[in-house]
């Protein structure tokens, strides 16, 4: 997160961290949506990851911190009417459910679609400088604005005319999600509306917002898989 502050210890109980098993390096964020499922970005998918829940400072362990492995992973595989931009979403089933605790609690799925003009909260352990990386020990939080999708199309002409993508940032620059914030939540008016997906190589430039996968448009898929319907039809 560029331009943010350390998150309040109580405001990110649903925020999880994905690590590479072999190198131990921090990869991505994710969001706990119930006791055994995490929603993240598809581009965070590595063959061997483990997931930390209930973490704040990466070098100080809480008593209720939990470590899990993916038992199952689901990628959004629809090709008709979808471009590669529309598919940066992944569901992970934990190898063992987690219990709610002081630092762990799920974030519910959105009950209504996001509204352009909303102020949204983003958070993560991603780099705090760009283009060179500086990774913080604690998650950073900051507020950004939800723009009309056409704003991002103006910046990234390759984007399709219509898509399941949200466009958000701060037009003056200086505030943004960045590398390794991927997979974390975009929370607008208290609702979980987006997943950190993609942005320019250099983060937080003026008039260059970033892209977020739109959770609301994938609800059918998410709910079907959680319900046990593993061969979900495309919407």
UniProtKB/Swiss-Prot annotation:
Span of domain Peptidase S1: 1-227
Keyword terms: Blood coagulation cascade activating toxin, Disulfide bond, Glycoprotein, Hemostasis impairing toxin, Hydrolase, Protease, Secreted, Serine protease, Toxin
PROSITE patterns linked to this entry: TRYPSIN_DOM, TRYPSIN_HIS
Major subcellular site: secreted
Spans traversing the lipid bilayer: none
Record: active site: 43 (charge relay system), 88 (charge relay system), 182 (charge relay system)
GO MF term set: serine-type endopeptidase activity; toxin activity
Post-translational modification: Glycosylated.
Glycosylation sites: 45, 57, 81, 132, 148, 229
Tissue: Expressed by the venom gland.
Disulphide bond pairs: 7-141, 28-44, 78-234, 120-188, 152-167, 178-203
Enzyme class: hydrolase
SMART domains assigned: Tryp_SPc
Alphabetical list of InterPro entries matching this protein: Peptidase_S1_PA (IPR009003), Peptidase_S1_PA_chymotrypsin (IPR043504), Peptidase_S1A (IPR001314), Trypsin_dom (IPR001254), TRYPSIN_HIS (IPR018114)
SUPFAM superfamilies named in the record: Trypsin-like serine proteases
Activity control: Not inhibited by hirudin.
Record text on subunit structure and interactions: Monomer.
Family membership noted in the UniProt record: Belongs to the peptidase S1 family. Snake venom subfamily.
Protein name as catalogued: Thrombin-like enzyme bilineobin
């Amino acid at each position: 997160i560029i331009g943010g502050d350390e998150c309040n210890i109580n405001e990110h109980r649903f925020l999880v961290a994905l690590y590479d098993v072999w190198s131990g390096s921090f990869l991505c964020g994710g969001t706990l949506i119930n006791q055994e499922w995490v929603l993240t970005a598809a581009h965070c998918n590595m063959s061997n990851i483990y997931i930390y829940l209930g973490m704040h400072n990466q070098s100080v362990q809480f008593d209720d911190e939990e470590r899990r492995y993916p038992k199952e992973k689901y990628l959004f595989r629809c090709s008709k009417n979808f471009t590669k931009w529309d598919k940066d979403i992944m569901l992970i089933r934990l190898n063992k459910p987690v219990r709610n605790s002081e630092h762990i609690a799920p974030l519910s799925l959105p009950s209504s679609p996001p509204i352009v003009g909303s102020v949204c909260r983003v958070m993560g352990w991603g780099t705090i400088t760009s283009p060179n990386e500086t990774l913080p020990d604690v998650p950073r939080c900051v507020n950004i604005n939800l723009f009309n999708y056409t704003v991002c199309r103006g910046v990234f002409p390759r984007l399709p005319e219509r898509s399941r993508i949200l466009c958000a940032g701060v037009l003056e620059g200086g505030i943004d999600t960045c590398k390794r914030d991927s997979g974390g939540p975009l929370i607008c008016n208290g609702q979980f509306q987006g997943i950190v997906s993609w942005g320019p190589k250099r983060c937080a430039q003026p008039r260059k917002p970033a892209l977020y996968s739109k959770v609301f448009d994938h609800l059918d898929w998410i709910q079907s898989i959680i319900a046990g319907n593993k061969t979900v039809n495309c919407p």
